[in-house]
Amino acid sequence: MSWDDEDFAVPSGSKEKPVLNSWDDEFAENDDEPVLESWEDEETAKPKPKAAAAAAAKAPKKASPSPAATPAATKNTMLDIDTLDDKTRKELLRKAELESDLNNAADLFGGLGVAEEHPRARAEREREQLAAVAQPAALTKDTPIQSHPLFSDLETKKDYQELRKALATAITSTSNKSLLNYSGGLAIDLIRDISKPMTVENIRQTIATLNVLMKDKEREERQARLAKVKGGTATGGAGKKKAKATRANLGGAFKKDNDFDLGGNDNFDDFGEDDFM
């Protein structure tokens, strides 16, 4: 008896399931399961989908606005806007539209690397910055006077003349408040302080100019003092007028050419030699 004489029956299930060619084919059918490096490694337990669903169910849900509350809020907002004037209402609507456009642009181009600031928003911001810069800053005692354009733009002789006129008008107007403080606390010390950077020749010219001013002031004060006295003159004196030499009015009886008759003897030689005494 030999092995060739034996008959082997082929199982009927071989037609439905193909025969594996190698051990690799067996593992290839189960691609979803990872291959363990050793038989001792335990397979990790897969998370149960039921646990994730239960956690999601326990999470608090955001309350969605009720349909009845939304029209009421919109109605109140519209009523507040309607109470404003046209200019303010248009400005609010324009800002709301701009904000809506920015939000839509951010949602649309958020992941494409587009600049975050919208061109319209950038233009609006630049306009507000220019308006803020154009407004003059409030002046205080701590504000440096050198920041004034009259000082910062000093270049030509005309600029210095304009500065001199502005300072003279502003400083001399303070004399009306207190002439004593103006003279003793401002003018004299100011002339001394501003003369320090000057040369000796310039100081001499300043003294000569002040001497001319002093003589003019003396003449004006003397004329004002004499004007108060009736008949006063600018040359001084007590203010009295000199009497003019005039003839007394004796009437028509006394004339130069009239002959006067005294009623006596005109012969003054009637005395004798013995009538001497």
UniProtKB/Swiss-Prot annotation:
It comes from the Eukaryota. Keywords: Coiled coil, Cytoplasm, Initiation factor, Protein biosynthesis. Residues 23-43, 267-277 have a biased composition (Acidic residues). It is found in: Cytoplasm. Residues 199-230 form a coiled coil. Residues 1-80, 257-277 are annotated as: Disordered. Gene3D superfamilies: Eukaryotic translation initiation factor 3 like domains (1.10.246.60). One of its GO terms (biological process) is formation of cytoplasmic translation initiation complex. InterPro entries: Acyl-CoA_DH_CS, eIF3-like_dom_sf, eIF3j. One of its GO terms (molecular function) is acyl-CoA dehydrogenase activity. GO terms for cellular component: eukaryotic 43S preinitiation complex; eukaryotic 48S preinitiation complex; eukaryotic translation initiation factor 3 complex. Residues 50-75 have a biased composition (Low complexity). Component of the eukaryotic translation initiation factor 3 (eIF-3) complex, which is involved in protein synthesis of a specialized repertoire of mRNAs and, together with other initiation factors, stimulates binding of mRNA and methionyl-tRNAi to the 40S ribosome. The eIF-3 complex specifically targets and initiates translation of a subset of mRNAs involved in cell proliferation. Component of the eukaryotic translation initiation factor 3 (eIF-3) complex. Belongs to the eIF-3 subunit J family. This is Eukaryotic translation initiation factor 3 subunit J. The gene is HCR1.
